[in-house]
Amino acid sequence: MIPDLDIFRSANVLVKQHGQDAPIHAAMRADAMLEKGDLEGQVVWKRIVRAVEEIQRTDRPSGEVLQ
């Protein structure tokens, strides 16, 4: 299993490259993995999608820290 830190690093790169479209790009990669039959790859990209969404989330309570 890929560590969460690596997932968030990948998500951060996508956000820097694609901005607000980063979740779409990650979801497209997840779909491509599924089409290839690479279920493990799809799981990784779904984790990246969630990490991108977390990075881009703006409604953080005061004091909440992004891990």
Where does each model-flagged region fall?
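Amphipathic, hydrophobic secondary-structure cores in small proteins
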Residues: 12-57
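Short, charged, intrinsically disordered terminal tails
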Residues: 54-67
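Short, charge-rich, low-complexity alpha-helical interaction segments
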Residues: 1-13, 67
